[in-house]
Structure formats: C-alpha cells, structure tokens
A protein has these predicted regions:
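Aromatic-lined ligand-binding clefts that engage carbohydrates, nucleic acids, or primary amines
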Residues: 135, 159, 167-197, 227
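Acidic/polar, glycine-enriched structural segments that form the non-catalytic walls/loops
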Residues: 29-45, 96-126, 225, 250-256, ...
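Accessory carbohydrate-binding/adhesion or oligomerization-edge regions at the termini
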Residues: 30-34, 44-57, 61-65, 96-151, ...
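Aromatic-rich carbohydrate-recognition surfaces in CAZymes
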Residues: 404-405, 437-454, 513-622, 638-652, ...
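Carboxylate/His-rich catalytic cores and anion/metal-binding grooves
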Residues: 67-98, 187, 249-259, 521-563
Length: 820
C-alpha cells in the first residue's frame, strides 16, 4: 500500500545527496497575477498535467486538504513547504497515512475466500450464515480478465458477486489506527460482521481508504471476524478486492498550516496565494499546452512558479521545498523503484522510475504508468534524495532565498515515457521528441531558457479562452471553459507516425480505456474546431486509414483503435454503426467547410460514400443498435440517432457540393430532407419529440440537430428546433437538463450542444447556469464528471474525459457566424 513521507526526516538529516544549479531568469511579478480572477470552485484542480498518465490534481478546496492525486484517484503525492525565519508552513499536500498490512489485498497476496455468483438471501453477510451449495472457494481478486491481479474470473453483465472473508485478529490489532482499503467495479457494498460500512452506488475506484473510527472499529473483535462484500457489475469491467491495514504514520509536529488566500483556474495556469506568517507565497502551476505549438502541446514538462512577498516590510529568511515520491512512476505502490541523482549537460536532476521498466506492457482504463522516468531538475535550486518513515525515497527540490523582502523563481517537473504509444504495431514517442532526436534533457533546457516567453504566451492564451467564453455567454461560461481546457488536452497523446501523419489520440478515461474512440472524438470536437482543426483531423485520420487499408471492412466507421496505449485495431466488443458513421461524416464536413475545400477527405471519398449510403439506408428508423447514450439501455427507433444519420447524409451532400459533384449533392440533400420530413412526423408528440419513434410520453436531448443550425442547411424546419428547446426548459432540474425522460442523470457535454441550439444568448445561458452550479457544488471531487445526476449533483460515472471539449459548441457557433 501507499508509503508516505514524514517531513521531519526530510528537513533534517535524511538527505543522502544534493546538487544544485542556478542562473535562470527570474519571473516577472505580472506572471503571478491571473488575467481574470475566477469564482468557480473546480471539483478537482489541475496542477501538473500533460497526458493520460502524467496527470496530477488536487480534488480539494484547499491545496493542503489532502494528497494530490492522479485522475484515477491514485495518490501522486506532491508536498510543498515554506520555511520563514525557522518556522515551516505546509502549503501543499497533507500529512498522510502510512498503511501497513494486517490482512492483504490481491497485489500482495492471492488471498482466499468463499464466494458466490448467485443472488443471496437476507443475512448472507452475517457471521453465523452457513454458505450453501452456491458458494465455493476462490482467490482474489475477482473480476474481468486483464485487470490487475484478477485470479478468479467474473465479468458477466448485470451480475452479482458475494464474498465472505474470514479474518483473525489479535488484541493488539484492535489497538491500531485501522483502515479497510477496497477496489471495486461497479456497485459495491462492504460489511463488517454483518453491519454495512460502505455503499458506493454505481462507480469504479481503486484503493479507497475507509478509516475505521471508534464506532466502526467496535464492529471488530478479537478472534474470528467476517468481512463481506457484494459487488454488482452493470456493464463493462468488473472487480472486487479488499483488505485491512494499520496506520504507522508519524505526526509532523511543529509544522504550521499555510492559509490559502486565493485560487484562480484559467486555461493553462492555476494560481494560488498563501499566507505563511509575515510572508505571502504565490504559486502558479502551468501546463504550457498551447494549441498551435505542437512541441509545447505535447511537452511532458510543467512549470511551477513561486514568489515570496513580505507583508510587514521586513526581510525574512525564506526557504521553499517541494517534495515528490516514486509513486509518480508507479502503477502499484509495491513495485520496486530506483531513485537517483544525475547530471546532464551541466544541469542536475533527481529521477525516479521502476526497476523493471515494462515499456508499453500495460493497457487499460484505471491504471497508472510504470515505465519511463519522472524528473525534477535543479534549474533554480537544489535537488536532493531523502527518505520517509517507511525508508522510501523522496525527491526533493529546495530553493534557498536567504533574507529577502520579495523574490521569485520557478521549477520544473517532467516525465519521459521513453515510448509513448503503439500504433499499428509500431512504437512511437510523443511529438515533442521528434522521433527520438530530442531528449528529455534537451526539452528541459528549452523550457528553462524560454520560460519568460512561454509563460507570456500562456497568459495570452488564457485571455483568449476566457474572452471567447465571455463574448459567447457570460462570466460563468468563461470560467467553465477556462477550467476545462487542460482537462481536455491532458486526455490525449500527440505524435507523428512514420508516414508523417499528425496523430492525436484520446484515452477514454474512466469508461473502458479505449484509444481514439470515435464517440469521444465527436463530442469533444468543438474545442479543436474552434482553435486548431488540424488536431481534429489528427483524431480522425487513423480511423479513415483503418478502413482505407482494408483492416476494417464494415460499411461504417470503427468504434476505436484499441486500448490505450496500444492502438492496433478495434477492441470494443460491439459496433455502433449509425453512431460512428454519422460522427465521422459530420465532422469531416465541418472540417471541409473550415478549409474551404475537400482536400482532407478526397483520399477517403470511397470510404465516405460507403458510410453515407449506410446512413441513408439504415438511419431513418434505427434498429436496436448501440449508441453513445445507451446508459439506461439501448432502444430501437432512437430519434436522436436518426437525426445523427440525417445530418451525416447532409454532411456527405455538403462535401459532394464542395467537390463539384452537383448531381450527387442534390441527390443526398433530397434524401436528407425526405428523411427529416418523415422524422418530424413520426417523432412528434404534441409540444416536443419522442426519445424513440414508438415510445409515447418520452423525450430526449436532440443535440445532433445543432449542425443544421451551424451549417444553415435548414434540413429540419426552424420550428422543430425551437419547439424542442422550449420544451427542454420545462424539464430542467437543479443541476441541469436530463439526457432523456428515463433517468435524472445527464451528460453535460451534450447539454452544452443542446444549449447552442437556443436562438438567443439569454436562452443559451438558461442551460449553462445549472451546469455551472453543478461544477461549482458537486460533492464528487474528481476532474469534472460529464455523467451526473441533475438532482443530486453527484457523478453517475466518468471523470477526466475529453468529451467536455463539447463545452465550446457555442463558441464554435460564434466563430462560424463571424466567418460568414
């Protein structure tokens, strides 16, 4: 389990070596002032983010409220301290538990327990329960093949697993500070001697630490105990594992807590200010993800800038410390690591990574990287290796300001994955490495020497994102976009293949881990269509090539290209024919409209024609197909899926017209109009349109219709969209518009698409404000969940997904209108 630092050992004699380097430009005071202050309480604050693996967040209001984490919720500890005249203040991270095993989990031992996959009667979790014939013995963990440490297979959809684990405890065990740690997928209930102690609802999480307070610990007794779990798998992966641990952490006595004065989140920068006695500390976390600079967009290096200011007019002796752990480079805390001091071209580094270095050996959803190396250079301070209370190494950065009234500097941290992705059985590094001709050390040197100019460009980019949101909506919309930019970009990997194609692959975070999923590429598209359509092409080219090459032969687009980071072909078990074909054609048409020509699609015209014909022939009244919105089950005769097909046929006609194929364009335009007329008649139910053609008293968001407005193609009568939008306003809940009439949950990416269908800004903002309220108030402290309950504000599932690039749909509409 997690082994965490005891600060007193780091700040005293635990250092085993140190090296330093100075000489970089001091940041200007302007860099510590955000372009705009923001009021939005982001559920999880981006700190150091680069790609799906190098991704560190603070899911707290205060940076000291807990341990910094990867989006998976795995701990990736960063601790920050400022010592002023001998008094140390903690400004980042929290004093953490160090868990030692009493009863192991599956990553330490193949523990054995009784289990059943038959629905059990009341009392099955009680110690006195006598398991019958449906019970058998199995080894942990239970779950889907391919998930970590699964030794007993269980993965059936809509199925149940019951586990009874007998645990023998000594009197001394009960005197400890106890934790139960569990991992699960999906709905999970945990019992101690028959009493329920955890009930998760539908979610999937690894390594949840449940502290046993006095009341919960009293459920245990000396001798034999039964810890029981019930897990229900709804869909996708399944998993169950749990264990019992004790906290052996040592209190960091004498360290005071800094007072957080402010927090502002903009597109590329997160700004904090802390009060540390007579000194204020400004800290800026910067991910220089400039969308028009591919080297910076793909760079695995982030800045942390810091400034100290005396508030009493006096000089103070000041030292800043930032401390990381080898967990930055681990998938499981039990993996052996190697942490060293090293030098390259006159600059010193502290580096950590696993001993085994299993490059690209793992693929999947809720996992962290365990190959490559995490680095902190001594660009403006000293780097050291320390040890924690469990004798684990620490990576320490120190800046000695000495006596000063005001001073500023910056540090960097980065991650070299060595090999980042496999595409069609060839391995590639990120774009920034230019095929291996640029090393991580050269990239650090560039980022160091160009710090001032890069930071200024980031400020200008922050301004553009905020101002575009303000112009299209209001301050709340601008703050939503500002808080979402790094979230979207960090779910991707940018690289170039051997043929020179620019490729930009998403990871389907927290919803199966697929790579380059087309029904993520579609909802996230507005961001990239606004600011860099070449990146949109970089998500689509590989899908077109997959069909063009003959590797994918079906008459519609593939769902995905594999499981991240292995992109060798579709792995998803079921197709989404209308969904993916419609997505690809619609986006292709929008790209052609932005380019003013069809050069991008000409190579793929035969493939595109095949897909268009599939939509034309099958999209009027869809059969029972999977689609992207089948959370409550997929229904035949889906009206929104039919709209997707109609707009896909329209998209083909628009591209044909641009190619000069007038007869083809007229034919498919006529077909789209005929489909739309029938759709309007068959879907109409008084003041709105149904969820499915044959389902009375239903409704759903018809977000796919927004393209008819953006393109001004008038495939549907104007009154159709107006009628739907007016109806939606009667269905909103506290935190937004449900996805459809079946459940209270929604998808905020689609809500923003739907909002863009509104005829005026005032109506648009009526949809935006509940989404803002959700982001601002949700108790689900994760990188913004796109799938959530509109009444409770709690996530239903999904986090850190790139689909919230869809928040930019209104900005896209504004930009397209300004072009016309």
């Amino acid at each position: 389990m997690k082994r965490l630092l005891t600060l007193s050992l780091v700040l005293s004699a635990a250092l085993v070596g140190s090296v330093s380097c100075t000489g970089s430009t001091e940041p200007s005071a302007e860099l510590f002032q955000p372009y705009k202050t923001t009021a939005l309480r982001t559920p999880s604050v981006p700190l150091v983010v680069s790609d799906p693996y190098f991704s560190i967040w603070s899911p707290y209001d205060q940076l000291i409220d807990g341990t910094t984490r990867h989006w998976t919720n795995d701990e990736k500890p960063l601790d920050g301290f400022l010592t002023v005249d001998g008094q140390t203040y903690r400004w980042m991270g929290a004093e953490r538990t160090i868990l030692a095993t009493i009863v192991p989990m599956a990553d330490e031992e193949a523990w054995t327990a009784q289990y059943s996959r038959t629905v059990q009667p009341e009392g099955w979790q009680q110690p006195a329960f006598a398991p019958g014939d449906s019970w058998q013995e199995g080894q942990a963990a239970w779950g889907s093949d391919g998930l970590s440490y699964v030794r007993t297979h269980w993965s059936d959809l809509n199925s149940d697993l019951y586990v009874r684990r007998t645990v023998n405890l000594k009197a001394d065990d009960l005197k400890e500070d106890l934790y139960i740690v569990y991992s699960h997928d999906d709905v999970f209930e945990l019992y101690i001697n028959g009493t329920k102690v955890a009930d998760t609802g539908e979610t999937w999480v690894e390594g949840v630490q449940l502290h046993l307070d006095a009341k919960l610990k009293a459920l245990l007794h000396e001798g034999e105990n039964v810890i029981a779990a019930h897990c229900h798998n709804t869909t996708g992966g399944a998993y169950t594992d749990f264990g019992l641990f004790k906290n052996i952490g040592i209190s960091n006595a004498g360290i005071e807590t800094a007072k957080q004065k402010s927090l502002d989140v903009l597109a590329t920068n997160t700004y904090y200010t802390f009060i540390c006695g007579p000194v204020e500390l400004d800290v800026v976390f910067t991910a220089p993800m400039l969308i028009d600079d591919y080297d910076l967009l793909s760079s695995p290096i982030n800045y942390i800038s810091y400034q100290v200011r005396s508030t009493d007019g006096k000089e103070h002796d000041i030292q800043l410390n930032v401390i990381a752990t080898p967990e930055m480079a681990l998938n499981k805390a039990s993996q052996p690591t190697n942490t060293i001091l090293m030098e390259n071209n006159g600059l010193q580094y502290v580096r950590t990574g696993t001993v085994d270095q299993p490059i690209l050996a793992k693929k999947g959803d809720g996992i962290c990287i365990d190959w490559g190396y995490f680095y902190i250079p001594a660009a403006n301070g000293t780097v050291t290796v320390g040890t924690d209370a469990a004798d684990k190494p620490l990576l320490c950065y120190t800046h000695e300001f000495g006596k000063t009234r005001q001073a500023a500097s910056f540090m960097m941290m980065g991650y070299d994955e060595i090999e980042d992705i496999e595409y069609m059985y060839k391995r590639y590094k990120g774009y920034w490495a230019h095929g291996g001709t640029v090393s991580i050390f050269q990239m650090f040197q560039r980022m160091r020497s160009q710090y001032q100019s890069i930071m200024q460009r980031c400020r200008e980019f922050d301004k553009m994102i905020y101002d575009d949101g303000l112009a299209a909506g209001n301050e709340h919309y601008a703050e939503i976009l500002s808080a979402s930019y790094r979230h979207v970009i960090a779910a991707h990997k940018l690289f170039q293949d051997d043929e020179g194609n620019l490729l930009f692959f998403s990871k389907e975070n927290n919803s199966n881990g697929c790579v380059n999923t087309v029904d993520l590429t579609y909802p996230e598209a507005p961001l990239f269509l606004c600011y860099n359509p070449e990146l949109q092409k970089a998500m689509m080219t590989s899908v077109f090539d997959y069909s063009l090459s003959g590797r994918w032969t079906k008459p519609f687009a593939a769902h995905d290209l594999g499981t991240y980071p292995i992109a060798n072909g579709q792995v998803y078990g079921a197709d989404m024919p209308l969904e993916e074909a419609g997505n690809m054609l619609t986006l292709a048409a929008q790209l052609c409209k932005l380019d003013g020509n069809t050069n991008y699609v000409d190579k793929y015209w035969n493939v595109i024609t095949t897909w268009a014909d599939y939509l034309s022939e099958n999209g009027q009244d869809p059969e029972n197909q999977l689609c992207t919105d089948d959370f409550a089950g997929h229904w035949a005769h889906n009206t929104n899926l039919s709209i997707k097909a109609i707009m896909g046929v329209t998209a083909y006609a628009e591209m044909a017209r641009m190619k000069g194929l007038r007869d083809v364009a007229d034919k498919y335009t006529a077909r789209a109009r005929a489909m739309a007329r029938k759709w309007e008649k068959d879907a109409r139910e008084g003041d709105h349109y149904r969820l499915a053609f044959d389902r009375n008293n239903t409704w759903s968001q018809k977000y796919n219709m927004v393209w008819d407005k953006l393109w001004q193609t008038s495939i549907f009568p104007a009154a159709t969209m107006e009628r739907e939008v007016k109806y939606y306003l009667t269905k909103q809940n506290k935190y937004g518009l449900p996805l459809d009439s079946r459940k209270d949950y929604s998808k905020n990416d689609w809500t923003m698409w739907t909002a863009a269908m509104a005829g005026d800004r005032e109506t648009f903002l009526k949809f935006v404000e509940p989404v803002y309220k959700y982001i601002n108030e949700t108790e689900s402290r994760v990188p913004t969940s796109d799938w959530y309950d509109t009444k409770t504000g709690l996530m239903a599932g999904f986090k850190a997904r790139s689909v919230i690039g869809g928040f930019w749909m209104r900005v896209l509409e504004e930009k397209l209108n300004n072009r016309n």
